[in-house]
């Protein structure tokens, strides 16, 4: 994720315009089991990383096209890549 042209660098993440709607959107994805990890980079305003539990990069793009912040050009999907996990937190090989 990368800041869009309407990101306000004078404000923190939770102070950006339409934060409540963006937070509800992200919470819904999390509640549906679609977000595995997510959070902003440091320093604030440097973008964010989101790891989704989806099958394709296209599915990730389609999901984030509905983000209220994407509609307002506040935070945009910079790149979507498909990723194969070989090791989990316990060091086991994933298949």
Regions found by a protein language model. Give the residues of each.
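Conserved, structured core segments of small domains
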Residues: 1-95
